């Protein structure tokens, strides 16, 4: 599968059809998984909410609840409640419904871009992407540490290329931090 078809397949997960005012639908498209992963339905609810607001607003707060597992083979209906439409702030509540039951619920606040305080750490001096090993290169390099029955999953092409500045050895877990309880001596 080429990079283009992987990306096109992934982007297809986010094409929502307008059913009515504030109601959108996504037709299930199985891409090899039985269940819908959280990031997908979160992105879809955010897209549904964005379709009901002015473009000058951007999401600045997102609170959500995963209620039930979703099924990739079934369509999802997204209902958007317009809680508030203000000059600076807009609020939406979105429910993702599958088979008549909510699988995901969220509340999203949008804000107009305004000048304000900015708290940001200075960018550290790190290697550029071309100097780092890609995740696919790393997976190929250590595939012999993985049981062969998992090679197809381990080595499958990914939609997004990751390059870690400080690579983590996922196959050699270790405790990075621990501390005693403040009242450890009383236990």
Predicted feature residues:
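Terminal targeting signals and extreme-terminal segments of soluble enzymes
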Residues: 1-179
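Single conserved hydrophobic/aromatic residue that forms the stacking wall/gate
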Residues: 177-187
């Amino acid at each position: 599968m080429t990079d283009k078809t992987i990306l096109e397949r992934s982007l297809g997960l986010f094409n929502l059809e307008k059913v009515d005012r504030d109601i959108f639908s996504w037709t299930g498209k199985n891409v090899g998984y039985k269940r819908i992963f959280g990031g997908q339905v979160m992105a879809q609810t955010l897209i549904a909410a964005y379709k009901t607001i002015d473009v000058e607003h951007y999401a600045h707060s997102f609170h959500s609840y995963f209620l039930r597992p979703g099924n990739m083979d079934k369509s999802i209906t997204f209902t958007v409640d317009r809680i508030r439409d203000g000059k600076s702030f807009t609020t939406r509540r979105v429910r993702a419904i599958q088979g008549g039951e909510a699988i995901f619920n969220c509340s999203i606040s949008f804000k107009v871009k305004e000048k304000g305080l900015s708290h940001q750490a200075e960018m550290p001096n790190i290697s550029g992407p071309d100097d780092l090993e890609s995740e696919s290169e790393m997976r190929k390099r250590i595939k012999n540490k993985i049981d062969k029955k998992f090679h197809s999953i381990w080595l499958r092409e990914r939609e997004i290329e990751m390059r870690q500045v400080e690579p983590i050895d996922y196959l050699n877990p270790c405790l990075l931090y621990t501390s005693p309880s403040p009242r450890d001596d009383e236990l």
